[in-house]
Amino acid sequence: MNNRVHQGHLARKRFGQNFLNDQFVIDSIVSAINPQKGQAMVEIGPGLAALTEPVGERLDKLTVIELDRDLAARLQTHPFLGPKLTIYQQDAMTFNFGELAEKMGQPLRVFGNLPYNISTPLMFHLFSYTDAIADMHFMLQKEVVNRLVAGPNSKAYGRLSVMAQYYCNVIPVLEVPPSAFTPPPKVDSAVVRLVPHATMPHPVKDVRVLSRITTEAFNQRRKTIRNSLGNLFSVEVLTGMGIDPAMRAENISVAQYCQMANYLAENALLQES
């Protein structure tokens, strides 16, 4: 039997589809999400409704975003979920979550078993809507969760770590083996909770500057910042901020990156390119 077929649906590689089918894992995720009636719950990539059904059972209304037209059609005719669902057959990568929160009159609670081939760019898309999001629970490749939660001085620490922790409190929830899916992915998975900061611990004047600095630093992560960011900061400026120019990108904390971004923004030293 083709192990890419689950409940009569052929998993599509181009959509990165792996369907969750382990009841213990499903129950654990739903318990972590803890959906409540009256909340603006939004699922990205409901697939064959492994999470949609148990979450939907607890709710009067549930919004889902599903790119695959066949799966969206199945949900429309679902025996008990159908009437509760608002289905957007759209790409989550271009979806306007701010408009949806405005329409629903409250911040969104977003969850999903995300396609691993788009998980990182989708995270960055969602970060731009954190003022419209109450919290997020996602199943991701374990390596991506490790990067989201990583601190300085570790190999996993990178641009994703800095930007995620700038916007959110990031909490690992549970690890999930490949056997919990059909077809089984070639990697381990994990569930993570991201809660946007109510008050930014390290506010920056222009987040585009922070994004630019972290991109340049981590694109040359083996170099010291004296070299990788030498076009933006002199040794004297770095030292004046209490940042050792001999450090590499992975040694610099989120707070220090924010400090550097604010220096550039305050002094109008970064030209858009």
Swiss-Prot record:
Record's keyword terms, sorted: Cytoplasm, Methyltransferase, RNA-binding, rRNA processing, S-adenosyl-L-methionine, Transferase
Function: Specifically dimethylates two adjacent adenosines (A1518 and A1519) in the loop of a conserved hairpin near the 3'-end of 16S rRNA in the 30S particle. May play a critical role in biogenesis of 30S subunits.
Keyword rRNA processing (UniProt): yes
InterPro entries tied to this protein: KsgA/Erm, rRNA_Ade_diMease-like_C, rRNA_Ade_Mease_Trfase_CS, rRNA_Ade_methylase_Trfase_N, rRNA_adenine_dimethylase, SAM-dependent_MTases_sf
Name of encoding gene: rsmA
Keyword Cell cycle part of the UniProt annotation: no
Binding-site positions, S-adenosyl-L-methionine: N18, L20, G45, E66, D91, N113
The protein's name: Ribosomal RNA small subunit methyltransferase A
Compartment annotation: Cytoplasm
Organism: Escherichia coli O17:K52:H18 (strain UMN026 / ExPEC)
Reaction(s) catalysed by this chain's protein: adenosine(1518)/adenosine(1519) in 16S rRNA + 4 S-adenosyl-L-methionine = N(6)-dimethyladenosine(1518)/N(6)-dimethyladenosine(1519) in 16S rRNA + 4 S-adenosyl-L-homocysteine + 4 H(+)
Gene Ontology terms for molecular function: 16S rRNA (adenine(1518)-N(6)/adenine(1519)-N(6))-dimethyltransferase activity; RNA binding
Record-linked HAMAP family: 16SrRNA_methyltr_A
Enzyme Commission designation: 2.1.1.182
Domain of life, source organism: Bacteria
Record family assignment: Belongs to the class I-like SAM-binding methyltransferase superfamily. rRNA adenine N(6)-methyltransferase family. RsmA subfamily.
GO cellular component terms listed in the entry, alphabetical order: cytosol
Family annotation (PROSITE patterns): RRNA_A_DIMETH, SAM_RNA_A_N6_MT
Pfam families (UniProt xref): RrnaAD (PF00398)
NCBIfam families for this protein: ksgA (TIGR00755)
Gene3D superfamilies for this protein: Ribosomal RNA adenine dimethylase-like, domain 2, Vaccinia Virus protein VP39
